[in-house]
């Protein structure tokens, strides 16, 4: 009844307005103009349906309109008797067609009228399934349309090729849509996830294909047709995709879980909140390898989350296909009444053309992604209680320590509702089934290593305060990379800042930091790097209304080291472990602008001291996602040593090709949150500016030029000295034959070094130069290569030269070999000795790295990894920081021989059987070493000795099995 009254009032208002307007100039209403006839027909059909349902008399026509260089397909509404074109335009604008405009009848010449209803003949290269960026631009370039009449479509149902869609809005000329997903009972579906998409129920589902080229970000229609189908049940979402493509162009390769390689794949990103809070992304490679992770607004990707889902691929005569089953229970689905909106993006990697398709087809430089996803309207999806128990058992045989160990424990997860999720681990075994990279770091700055343990990764996004707590975000910001897999992926990490975060869970169960040693006792070689066992850990996360929260606690077992006394005898070193706790709460207001306020606190209790840190954070994103502001204010530290800190980040994305970032840091001399967080240094104030620019078309043979210009200045707060300053330019460009050239140049003005002396004064460093160049070849070939060179001016003005080369060899789908070799010839290399002293060295550094992967099947992998770092350095000068400070002066040597060597080895042979999601069997052999200085040894001797007398020599067998819904 209410709907009928509303419609009557609407029609009465329309006729009143029409009668008053009929005396206006006669003419036509134009809804839009398109290069593509199919898109014009789609709009015409939707408008015709709207006119009829609204009772408005009129006829929809499509006519050709010739511009200077282009033929446009113009959508006209010819008003019926007693109705003016201007009244129709007004109602069109109220209905969402804000770009409708008036065309006087005197300006309409006889032109060819075209059919409104499409013939539905679709070519794979035609833009039949969405408004491409070119079509949207065409609405602004109709020869008779003014700038004020430019608009896109809003909230009107449009049948764009296959699958009914509603156009919501656009970003940078790229549209996003809403679709309706059909819901079935799980018992009705009966889909076997085998990648074939051949069950009868799939044929009852409308396919969607609205793919545009997102990498490189041309926004052009996809060359090859894709058909995506979605089915929702009370248990999860089924995704079926058919990728049409000539069979001879398919690239099928196997890879490990979450390993990003150049291969054909398809994927989907889901924001189950529908509010742009966090996205879950899933990909299946042709070859059945799987990748998943989370993405925080806007493109803060994290690959360190693994969910229990299914995915398979299948080769067809006309291309390939794939299927996924994504359980709702593994995602934090909020409560909602009735139908819910879920954000989504579909994607497809076409390896042979080095393109990534996506719907919506935003480039990787767009201002918004997570907050501007497509929307799917889904009925019957309710949060499900999730219970899972993952018991595990492990056996370790340590040959180096002559010790055997057996361990059993369990991970437990219980999620009764979206408001709360409880997870716990009892007697966990974080055995070394993953290895860190071998790094040479002889400075006073700590090296950051990412978390790899599943328990600490699950649900960790609530504890992320600033985007730059994530290393992948830092890399993307400073390189402007779009993660193209066109060429072998090699990057320079020189002058990349470390993350800053109050929570670095690698501290939990990591190397012990509060061990009291008796006089005359020191840790035996390698003991300081031994991880600490945990009694257990627990985590509580959830959401209540607009408030998200998280609590984490963990308890270490006693520390057990092997020590040695002055005569070389070994003794046991035992001490209590540490306890850790964190608390996080954040309130989010999601409207036209997005605003949030949060609190994060951490506590570490140890046998020697306690450390407590508190912080407040605030965040703002404007309606278009172009302006983003993040701020965090910090107070705390160790007992009686509390300090203050602040971080402010501002990003302004002017367009898809140009953006600006400003970062402000302030950390006073007392702030220190490294007992649980990560901060490379304190006592500084820094300003960093980053301008990112990209240009797709650079000429007949060059494309996708991407660059950043970085300027930064840092001051020591105690003395007001400039302790870091630099101007850096980084860029990459696509060359012919799928090659990529990456370049970097930096100029570092005169500054003072105040950290490396470990509190013994500052010394002046003259201005310096850095340059790096890397060429990478086609990653789609059986063998792809990279070669590079670089130079760096050292603190004493001498030069270090770097040369590197690498190869990836894939002779068959199920095997890959990666080998990289890095060589540095150092001159004038300043290395800290003790007290106020430094040595200047010349020397050589070799760093080979080898990875061999053999995939017996997608579920069975054998991997051999080898990393070694060898250094031979000869002292050629001895210096000391002057007592008055500010300069290095020549000093007397404190030893007869200050030469040194470094030999660090990590080797692992690992078998993994992925029995089911989160159910694995690992059999691992680890061998590693860190040799003391051997003055007379050659590089061959250093490598041989690292193998022959290891400090790590262990076999590990570990089985975990997941039980749950």
Task: Identify the meaning behind each predicted range.
Residues 361-384, 557-624, 739-792, 798-802, ...:
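Outer-membrane beta-barrel transmembrane domain signature of Gram-negative proteins
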Residues 24-25, 36-122, 130:
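Extracytoplasmic
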Residues 533, 631-965:
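Exposed, low-structure sequence patches enriched in small/polar residues
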Residues 1-10:
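Bacterial N-terminal signal peptides that target proteins for export
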Residues 331-340, 379-386, 415, 419, ...:
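Short loop/turn motifs that connect adjacent beta-strands in outer-membrane beta-barrel proteins
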Residues 142-586, 949:
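Structural preference for beta-rich elements and adjacent junctions enriched in aromatics
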